[in-house]
Regions:
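Glycine-rich flavin
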Residues: 55-63, 69-172, 177
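Glycine-rich beta->alpha junctions and the first turn(s) of the following alpha-helix
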Residues: 218-313
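Glycine-rich phosphate/cofactor-binding loops in nucleotide/flavin-utilizing enzymes
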Residues: 358-403
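N-terminal capping segment at the start of a domain
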Residues: 36-45
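Short, Lys/Arg-enriched N-terminal segments with co-localized hydrophobic residues
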Residues: 1-6
């Protein structure tokens, strides 16, 4: 795999010993996650500046046994359910959200991988066991330069051509979250048949013909390494067409459970950012003592009200996420959860900036970084217009059935 120019960022802290020996109480697990949050926060600013893939963070997560958390226990993983996965994502996001977003993609892939019988069993086992033993990461590469996001419809421009040796894949994927750190690419493509097969082809990172174009220079979530990945006649075995179906008879890739997992975990990243922003503001208000006041800003009703607004927004988020994670929210509301949680998170950080003024936007403080990061919540699928249009359409459809 060829790469463009790449900066180097040395590990900024030692990787601690493995701490995930079972059994572990809920209290001990929560304490361990709090320590993990603090460790990740130590280098969050440096990763924001360098925009490098956070390799040291993933070494740390692997040492804690968290990269295989949603791999089934029979394959050596944690066998985690959605509440457990959400707890981890929230803790990681409070420390370094780019790391959390890449981890979300890992959890989503493995949460449903073993149930996907379209995959050959040996590939399902190989990918899962590598996640547990080696910390190998996987993500789906779907967005393309010409088409954009497949959530809006259309055929991929990436082509898989069947040959005697295997599939030859050519095309480009943009916004490829985790690119430099991934071991496996699940490449959304189509075959060159008259009625093309459309879906995912599994490609190992070391396959010849792969180039990463380092074009990710974003305002927020800078360490996600969401670069363009190009495939030039990349050869994979025939059984690596792991999840494909004819264009004339498409199969949905996500069922209701998958949609809830995606909504809850993705939203938890941005809620975690807002929690960190809230914590910074509270600390700053307690420490800031203007000479003409003779007391900290935290004693003023105006700032108490602002913190109350923020905490109420985050309370709403917690209620929504916990309800969905524990199975109390129907899957049809998955998009609304993402809309509400990310919207509340953005508003919470905006309130923190309004309250802190210039210090909040100073590069010497993390609040401006939290703001840049939290705004990225609006970009993820499903986007706000698609969510609200779908809800409105469903409302009118329900009325037409009643009549």
């Amino acid at each position: 795999m060829r790469q463009g120019h790449r900066m180097t960022l040395s590990p900024l802290r030692p990787i601690p010993r493995q701490l995930h020996n079972a059994p572990e109480s809920a209290e001990d697990f929560s304490k361990r996650l709090a320590e993990l949050t603090a460790a990740l926060a130590e280098t969050a600013e440096q990763y924001d500046i360098s925009a490098q893939f956070p390799h040291a963070n993933f070494q740390l997560l692997h040492a804690h046994g968290l990269l295989g958390l949603t791999v089934p226990t029979e394959l050596g993983g944690g066998g985690a359910d959605l509440p457990r996965a959400q707890q981890v994502i929230s803790a990681v996001a409070r420390g370094e959200p780019s790391t959390a977003l890449i981890l979300v993609m890992q959890y989503l892939q493995h949460s449903r991988l073993q149930e996907n019988r379209n995959w050959p069993s040996h590939l399902r086992v190989q990918v899962a066991e590598q996640a547990v033993r080696e910390g190998a990461l996987i993500n789906a590469l779907r967005v393309e330069p010409d088409l954009g996001t497949p959530a809006r419809g259309g055929l991929p421009g990436t082509i898989a051509r069947r040959t005697a040796q295997g599939w030859r894949i050519s095309g480009s994927k943009i916004y490829s979250t985790g690119s430099h750190g991934l071991t496996w690419f699940a490449v959304w493509a189509r075959s060159d048949d008259d009625d093309p097969l459309v879906g995912s082809w599994l490609v190992h990172k070391d396959t010849p013909g792969i180039t990463i174009i380092e074009d990710w220079d974003h305002l927020g979530m800078r360490a996600t390494s969401s670069h363009e990945v190009r495939f030039d006649n990349v050869l994979v075995p025939l059984d690596h067409a792991v999840s494909v179906s004819p264009w004339s008879a498409p199969q949905s890739e996500l069922d209701g459970s998958g949609l809830l997992w995606m909504s809850v975990l993705l939203s938890s990243v941005y809620d975690g950012i807002a929690q960190s922003a809230r914590d910074w503001l509270v600390h700053w208000l307690e420490q800031r003592t203007p000479s003409n006041l003779g007391a900290s800003l935290s004693t003023l009703p105006r700032f108490q009200e602002t913190v109350g607004q923020i905490d109420t927004l985050l309370f709403a988020n917690c209620s929504l996420l916990q309800s969905a994670a524990h199975g109390h929210t129907p899957a049809q509301h998955a998009g609304q959860i993402k809309y509400l949680v990310t919207g509340n998170a953005i508003r919470a950080v905006e309130l923190a900036i309004e309250a802190s003024g210039n210090p909040g936007l100073s590069r010497s403080n993390p609040l401006q970084r939290h703001y840049r990061n939290v705004l990225c919540g609006r970009v993820h699928t499903p986007q706000n217009d698609a969510v609200l249009t779908g809800v409105g359409r469903a409302a009118f459809a329900a009325r037409s059935k009643d009549h």
